[in-house]
Amino acid sequence: MRPVVFSLILLTVSHFTASEEPTWQTVEEVLAVVGSTPILYSDITLATLVHLVEPEPMESLEDYRSRLLGARIRLEVEFRDLEDTGLLYRLDLETGTYRDALISRAGGEEVLGTSLRHEGLVWPDVDELVLRVAAVDAFVEQRLRPRISVTKEEIEAAYQELLVNEIAVSDEPVPPLSAVRDDLHTLLVERKLNEEIESWLERAEEHQEVMRFGR
């Protein structure tokens, strides 16, 4: 089935009589709605310009834009949750750092500026995206990461599972636990953090109605 794409429509009302057909012009495609916030085609265009997510090797443009839409919906759900709960206003946001990073990913300020003009976008559109990225990352780092703890037993279990058992089938020597303890700790922290992020997203989605129309 062909995906349905909703559009915001501009009706041209001048210079037609009652017997004439009105002229309709598509102003902007709405690809999804999070709560009452539309995700527009131009939002995905901007996400493409700044590489909000990196394309996969051999990935088609259609598939890439679909992943971008999914990532943009997720970002909006998380941001709206922070806003609705008031947490947004209690976070230390480093918007300048994230703005610089997105501009760099887009090829620099001059390149991005030219691309924005070509696509009918403006710098405040970039700032809105920056705010969302900065807020979500701030919540992850300032609120979720401090909750994570890794026990000695968990590190030892990971050592057994990821190194001893895997290397046992080869002739390679197993490195001592002391040599890989820090790496295993980091791995377990990031694994637990990802689980916390997914749990947060699930809770946020319970309070935000999401409609995805296509692409």
What are these regions (language model features)?
Residues V5-T17:
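Hydrophobic h-region of N-terminal signal peptides that target proteins for export
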Residues E21-T26, V30-V33, I39, L61-R215:
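Peptidyl-prolyl cis-trans isomerase
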Residues M1-P3:
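Positively charged n-region of N-terminal signal peptides that target proteins for export
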Residues A47-D63:
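Short, conserved catalytic-motif segment at the N-terminal edge
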